[in-house]
Amino acid sequence: PDYLQLARA
């Protein structure tokens, strides 16, 4: 999964 995008949730 995209961790960078998950951190922006």
UniProtKB/Swiss-Prot annotation:
Keyword list, A-Z: Neuropeptide, Secreted
Domain of life (superkingdom): Eukaryota
Protein's recorded name: Extended FMRFamide-2
Family listed: Belongs to the FARP (FMRF amide related peptide) family.
Subcellular location: Secreted
Single GO biological process annotation from the record: neuropeptide signaling pathway
Record's keyword annotation contains Secreted: yes
GO cellular component: extracellular region
Main location class: secreted
Function field: FMRFamides and FMRFamide-like peptides are neuropeptides.
